[in-house]
Amino acid sequence: MSYRVLEAADAHWRPSNQMGVLNTDLARQLEAAKLGARLWRLRPGQASTRHRHSETEELYVVLEGTGRLRVDEDVLTLAPHSAALVEPGSVRQVFNDTETEALWLVVGAPVEAANTLEMSAETLRELYPDGPRALPPELGGGEYEPE
């Protein structure tokens, strides 16, 4: 077969391990071997993990709402259908400090599933320099606490 289809109604959404952000791993559900792609739906006040990748680029595309993305010390504000490419080594975090939901498509190379609950302390420090639950200053800083 030369293609696969995942209907929106069939996509499996789940909250992320650390920050509770709803996401669906499109690439995994479509059995992609050379591509990583997820949709992330951030409610007002939510943020993804502040993290880095040592070898892979990531493309961030805002599909709905206003996209807010911190890359190292810069904060980007992106309109729907705008995109940002983040290079390897840069620390990045999407967050939502607006009053409406934001939907992101994040595309990159396939990465092994990163289970932050089972990582060594050294790996956690390398990938998540502020810890896997760090909130951006725009959301008050500190750590995310599950409800």
Spans of model-derived segments:
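Conserved hydrophobic/aromatic positions in well-ordered beta-strands
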Residues: 38-40, 60, 95, 105
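Ligand-binding loop in jelly-roll beta-barrel domains
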Residues: 31, 68, 88-115
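Conserved short histidine dyad/triad with adjacent acidic residue
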Residues: 23-25, 38-53
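Glycine- and acidic-residue-biased ligand/ion/polar-headgroup-sensing regions
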Residues: 55-57, 61-67
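A short, N-terminal "cap"/entry segment at the start of jelly-roll beta-barrel domains
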Residues: 1-34, 119-147
